[in-house]
Amino acid sequence: MEQTEGVSTECAKAIKPIDGKSVHQICSGQVVLSLSTAVKELIENSVDAGATTIDLRLKDYGVDLIEVSDNGCGVEEENFEGLALKHHTSKIQEFADLTQVETFGFRGEALSSLCALSDVTISTCHGSASVGTRLVFDHNGKITQKTPYPRPKGTTVSVQHLFYTLPVRYKEFQRNIKKEYAKMVQVLQAYCIISAGVRVSCTNQLGQGKRQPVVCTSGSSGMKENIGSVFGQKQLQSLIPFVQLPPSDAVCEEYGLSTSRTPQNLFYVSGFISQCTHGAGRSATDRQFFFINQRPCDPAKVSKLVNEVYHMYNRHQYPFVVLNVSVDSECVDINVTPDKRQILLQEEKLLLAVLKTSLIGMFDSDANKLNVNQQPLLDVEGNLVKLHTAELEKPVPGKQDNSPSLKSTADEKRVASISRLREAFSLHPTKEIKSRGPETAELTRSFPSEKRGVLSSYPSDVISYRGLRGSQDKLVSPTDSPGDCMDREKIEKDSGLSSTSAGSEEGFSTPEVASSFSSDYNVSSPEDRPSQETINCGDLDCRPPGTGQSLKPEDHGYQCKALPLARLSPTNAKRFKTEERPSNVNISQRLPGPQSTSAAEVDVAIKMNKRIVLLEFSLSSLAKRMKQLQHLKAQNKHELSYRKFRAKICPGENQAAEDELRKEISKSMFAEMEILGQFNLGFIVTKLKEDLFLVDQHAADEKYNFEMLQQHTVLQAQRLITPQTLNLTAVNEAVLIENLEIFRKNGFDFVIDEDAPVTERAKLISLPTSKNWTFGPQDIDELIFMLSDSPGVMCRPSRVRQMFASRACRKSVMIGTALNASEMKKLITHMGEMDHPWNCPHGRPTMRHVANLDVISQN
């Protein structure tokens, strides 16, 4: 017996070649993976042949037949024999040609693999041939039948019963044909968008019914026109063209790129993307197409970056994206995966930096647009003042000693109008501070409040101040709104800074701060804003650390408002009333210099006298202790091995706790749980064998009510006065027609006109309404996307789920409600009837493991 086993082992270890037929089937199954891959290979062959018209015909979504016809150059008769043989191609002759290949195909595997997986028939006619030829191939790619076949120039490839030579895959293919079909259509849409000057059409025929158009393009030469042909003109209204910008220094630093060493003009990116305004995006990533040298691909990093940047401006939607990256073919490796969808790219970080900089620049310019209502304002005296936006953006002319007088009366009126407008914003009048001559300047200094942190360093750049000099100038910063002035008035009253009577008619001076300061000193709340103190500075020495030059305000004759400097006041400084100051205060005497500041922050080594003490230590006692611990650990090992729940009750371990519950608790166990009581009028304590659980009574009841509403509620429909036309693609329209019952349960009703053109057959006649909730076409798009992935499965739009979650919350048992034993048992039993009992619709956990009684008793 032992001798026989040894012989069989030796035979199993022998290395032998696999027969050619098995190799062909194994490798072919790795080339053609799905319906979309098969269609992709045939479409690429037609485009490589120079076709301007490509017609794709499907029967039963591609299960029975896939047929692609084109008007390309056709196949010459001398190439018939090698047409469907493995690794036979006219695209390349050697490996070196791979870097210069410009066609989609180059490996010579597509037709050979299709022959191994299905029945393939090809009819073709070359431009030099007088009549076409029909070729029938066997599963090895060899011609079994060759007959004359009259047809125009071009090629038609028919693939029947795809995957039928692989029984398991064929059954799986039939079962998931709707998903396969949806993926195929998305791949086809990518080729329709990028193929300029090529008219692509696709039809599907169910049984003996009519051929239903799926996609149809007009053969336009531009990408924008192709997008409109595939997705409709409405989609174009929300798109903006991609504008490429060179990578910024900040983005280059983020990706570890050197701006001096990065190659210039390596990539050229073109395409379109959704506007960042809410409503312009989509609820899913179903319309995102990326191309490298016009080859459709799936660049995961690029896709992730585009969505992340878009979510910076529109958190709740995804963009429609069509981007084509043009780059030298020597910088690209397309021979990575069988379907050629994964592409390796040199300088990928540079491409990401270019995309991020460009997208941020595009969205910033779009997000910063604000529509301003031109409304008249009242000045202090009650007169109307017209708001001129263009005039407000101009700097206010200063009245300097050497400035020329105004030449035009129109200019004087304009200045007067703006001055009166600024006075209208001055809601808190204070006494005007007189000018002290050319040798002095006024400095408005802001002291940090007790909540404000102390700045760590002085600004090192040269400070430029804007303002006006003179005793009659009354300024308000254009960045100050009326609300800000009101907040400032409140602060000054609270801190005792108001020093004028209510009847004073003189305006207060609020010089404008340089824009470079605003980012360093943000005001988070009225309570956190700095209280202000006006100090008259004679010889003010504004000297940045490390420089020998001093910047004196009197050299410029400007009134300035300075930022709080470092260490200007302790962090716990209280607010105080304004006191009279001497006319000349030398701020530099009160401020610690750079040297003293840095010296206070440096740790100084201190010499310490340490006393040495002998410690008694026994190695034998330590070894004895270690043996005892190991023995105790061995005893407890089998006792602790049965612990099923180890996650803590904390937000950071919610996912781990949920995974443990899903693994260890089945639906039938809820009925077996023993009710121990109610804790804190909000939680039910249950016991299952030796495990104690805590159940949130509100969350558990809310989830049960939510699932019941999801399953059984039929939304009431509000009929429209006139049917509404939907801007759907042919594929989305087909999905809608096939799932009309699910739409009706969600409150949407349609009228279907079979004789109408495709994309215009379905019209909306009623919408769901429920009290204050209204729904619209965007919910229809979301349902179509969900049904494309799971056809025939009952699903709800996200806004319907939100409505059900709100209703379930209001009708559930609330925290603080006392429950008797039967009511608590009812809630626990309901948890066993749910599909997902671990979280309420708003994300709160319903149940957590508390303790194991065996572990507690042992301890």
Swiss-Prot record:
GO terms for cellular component: cytosol; MutLalpha complex; nucleoplasm. Residues 427-439, 485-495 have a biased composition (Basic and acidic residues). It is found in: Nucleus. One of its GO terms (biological process) is positive regulation of isotype switching to IgG isotypes. PROSITE patterns: DNA_MISMATCH_REPAIR_1 (PS00058). ATP binds at N45, D70, E109, A110, L111. Its EC number is 3.1.-.-. Keywords: ATP-binding, DNA damage, DNA repair, Endonuclease, Hydrolase, Nuclease, Nucleotide-binding, Nucleus, Tumor suppressor. It catalyses: ATP + H2O = ADP + phosphate + H(+). Residues 391-413, 427-455, 469-555, 578-597 are annotated as: Disordered. It holds the Pfam family DNA_mis_repair. GO terms for molecular function: ATP binding; ATP hydrolysis activity; ATP-dependent DNA damage sensor activity; endonuclease activity; MutSalpha complex binding; single base insertion or deletion binding; single-stranded DNA binding. Residues 512-525, 583-597 have a biased composition (Polar residues). It comes from the Eukaryota. A motif (Nuclear localization signal) lies at residues 574-577. Belongs to the DNA mismatch repair MutL/HexB family. Component of the post-replicative DNA mismatch repair system (MMR). Heterodimerizes with MLH1 to form MutL alpha. DNA repair is initiated by MutS alpha (MSH2-MSH6) or MutS beta (MSH2-MSH3) binding to a dsDNA mismatch, then MutL alpha is recruited to the heteroduplex. Assembly of the MutL-MutS-heteroduplex ternary complex in presence of RFC and PCNA is sufficient to activate endonuclease activity of PMS2. It introduces single-strand breaks near the mismatch and thus generates new entry points for the exonuclease EXO1 to degrade the strand containing the mismatch. Heterodimer of PMS2 and MLH1 (MutL alpha); this interaction is required for the stability of both partners. Forms a ternary complex with MutS alpha (MSH2-MSH6) or MutS beta (MSH2-MSH3). Part of the BRCA1-associated genome surveillance complex (BASC), which contains BRCA1, MSH2, MSH6, MLH1, ATM, BLM, PMS2 and the RAD50-MRE11-NBS1 protein complex. This association could be a dynamic process changing throughout the cell cycle and within subnuclear domains. Interacts with MTMR15/FAN1. This is Mismatch repair endonuclease PMS2. It comes from Mus musculus (Mouse). The gene is Pms2.
